[in-house]
């Protein structure tokens, strides 16, 4: 590669890299502030998936541009080359973003003694038409905040046991979903006072809790907690205020407290 071609290719691929980086940065804002706000990006593993996809995409596109760029090529050849590169890059990026979108949390559900984060793939979709009307569709942005109601009769309980053997816990069944606000008394009974368990934490965990409370502007004496679980992690704790509103979360195994 002569100097003229090298400088030309470096300039074009540099512009391509900059544009790709700006697009990736904008999509990162959508992912980490809308689809996966804290703590979901850590619990659901979206950081690794996004950086893998965007890293490959942002690097490979400009690299192909650098290899194929040549000032001696005719305009038609350049158009064909760049169209092919853009097609490959967009296809990979759209595929990756689609999978990130599908894996996003669509429901946060209180079940018995914990709060479970669910993506679309975790849910028994066959039951979705039988859910309450307001919960039959998943929001494009954000998630449903739900709780699980009690059994109506013995037959429903038996069906619940059968579904559990099939791999679907009660939180994963839309027919049992109700609004989170309708089960506040059950949530209050299940939640534990944070102050009573604080001494059981190690020094790092105590500092993490203090930092989380400070950011949430919540006093220790008014804070409660429940385990926060997903199919990827069981080692998180959600912190609630005195009204059982979810305020923040800390990476601590709450089942041990």
Swiss-Prot record:
Keywords linked to the UniProt accession: Fimbrium biogenesis
Domain of life: Bacteria
Entry protein name: Fimbrial assembly protein, serogroup E1
UniProt source species: Dichelobacter nodosus
């Amino acid at each position: 590669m002569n100097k003229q071609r090298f400088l030309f290719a470096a300039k074009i691929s540099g512009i391509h890299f900059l544009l790709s980086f700006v697009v990736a940065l904008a999509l990162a804002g959508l992912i980490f502030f809308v689809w996966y706000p804290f703590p979901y990006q850590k619990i659901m593993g979206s950081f690794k998936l996004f950086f893998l996809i965007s890293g490959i995409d942002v690097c490979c596109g400009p690299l192909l541009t650098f290899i194929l760029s040549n000032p001696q090529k005719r305009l038609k050849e350049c158009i064909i080359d760049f169209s092919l590169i853009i097609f490959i890059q967009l296809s990979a990026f759209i595929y990756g973003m689609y999978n990130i979108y599908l894996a996003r949390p669509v429901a946060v559900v209180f079940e018995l003694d914990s709060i479970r984060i669910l993506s679309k793939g975790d849910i028994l979709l066959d039951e979705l038409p039988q859910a309450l009307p307001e919960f039959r569709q998943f929001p494009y942005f954000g998630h449903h905040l739900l709780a699980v109601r009690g059994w109506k009769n013995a037959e429903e309980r038996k069906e619940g046991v059968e579904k559990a053997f099939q791999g679907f816990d009660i939180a994963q069944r839309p027919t049992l979903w109700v609004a989170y606000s309708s089960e506040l008394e059950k949530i209050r009974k299940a939640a534990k006072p944070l102050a009573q368990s604080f001494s059981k934490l190690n020094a790092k965990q105590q500092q993490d809790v203090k930092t989380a409370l400070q950011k949430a502007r919540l006093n220790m004496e008014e804070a409660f907690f429940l385990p926060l679980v997903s199919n990827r992690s069981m080692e998180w704790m959600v912190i609630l205020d005195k009204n059982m509103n979810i305020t923040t979360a800390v990476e601590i195994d709450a089942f041990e407290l």
